[in-house]
Amino acid sequence: MANQSPSSGDGPGGIPVGGSDGRSLAIHVVTRLLGLGIVFGLGYLTRPIWHGLVYSVFYSPGMAIFGGGAALAALALWFLPPFDVDDDTNRSFVRVLQEADSPVDILLGLGGSPGGKLRLFVTVVGVLAVLSILISIPAGMLEQRTLAQQTMSEASEVEEFPQANPENPRVVPRQVADITTRGSVSYRQYRLGASDIARMENGSLAWSYAIQPDGFRNTLIEHQRGVLVTDMTRMDDRQIKVYEEQFTYGEGMLLHRSADWNLKKTDYFAKYNDDAVEFSHDGRPYMYYPKTGHEWHLTPLPHTTPTWDGGALLHPDGEVEHLSPEEARSNPILDGQRLYPLTLTRDETGSLGYRNGIINQLPTVGAHEGQIEVAGLPSGANNAQPFVIDLEGERMSYVTAMEPYGEDTRGLDEVWFVDAETGEYTFFGTDDETLTGPERAMGIARSADSRTNWGQNFIVTEPVPVTIDGDLWWHIKVSPTDFTDVTRNVFVNADTSRTVEIRDDEAVRSFVAGSVDDEALQPVDEDDDDQDVVYYILVTDENGDVVERIPVERGQDTTIVDPDDERAQGNETAAG
């Protein structure tokens, strides 16, 4: 019987506990821990880069299975000691690469313990991928259903449309603002970033821009220079205000100097899907980033839904204030600004097709009872839902027009309003009455003026809903094809398809207020016959064709009344 050192004996199960084998195992574990520590250290320092992947693993059922399972499998195989594999080839990795014709050949050609571990890992990843797909499909449907039910439970129906703020009509479309504003400023090392909607210090709505570094060298070295806001409520004498102050972290700055990097570094478990809201307060520039979080629901199958997680207020000196919804609403710097995420509103209204259940909306077996969907916009609209408008009392609101389910439906079924400060939902249901949608309204605006060379010289653009005396109108702009001006505003009544053309900024305000002050209006046409006409009221039929064009001259005013109003009784001229 051979002598056996106690230090080299095996413990239960044949696992080495001492001697050289035990020391090898200890060295293996220490080495792997060191390698893992280096990986985690580098990952932590660069964590904003991996934010999307890590967040989805924590809050996406499919990615939790695939990404989380793959990470656990990798850790297990990483710490698993080398195991014996019968391999007669004993080829080096370099030789395997040279002789392989495809990645599969490399995978099958690797020998020894590394090759065995890699093949096992690939097998596990393949199984996890299939499982994640099988889980993601029902989890996605459950997410839509739960989100729709939450949205409906928190919403209240209104009997009439809330009144728009007549002092803040959206006169200047985004593309017109972008072109005219960029043509009015000159920066050699900077450019204007993407436009967004904010409130100016005087209460007007404005298109806002970050003044950010331009060019690769400047994005590495220079800082954001401040913010620029331009009034969207008037085309004449439009105000452009620049608030220049260097931002420590900002837009258009790369890596650790960027606002995005520092937002994710300071609050990792939140999504920053919305663009920054650039604005000023007491003459200083700021930027606000709405935040979206997610919450888990375990029944009937684990799934998540997005929620409002407050926002981040970025100061020029680099301070990042992470605010809860309540803190954001009470912050004096953010008074009057929009706080609720636009992207979350888009998700919530987009889920409403599931409000009557998953089966109801399925393409083959679904009854589609009460199913609605976000109204489509034509390609030339240069806008996207939800629309941002200002209501009375300087309350910004996100408006989404919903149409009945179906490819051929273009009329409106419901109109949803979201308070941009509180996230509260209200909606107006049309019941049996069908309102004109944005696509049809743009067609009516074009047909209302057959003398304009549409498409060649002028286009109708950016339909925005506006509520006037309880009625919904579509406020459409007519612009040259180069988007250098707004030649006139066209209002289309969503109920009657009645059309009003106005060229004057102050007249737009008067019309939205429910009255028209015609003294400041300009003639619609330059012809001698129309020199006293300040605007036209266009009456269209059900197809949108103009059947009557009523000129309103200087000294005249218009009032919209119900048919049973005594002022409308016996007016044969108007009726005939």
Regions found by a protein language model. Give the residues of each.
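Soluble extracytoplasmic regions of secretory-pathway and membrane proteins
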Residues: 3-4, 11-574
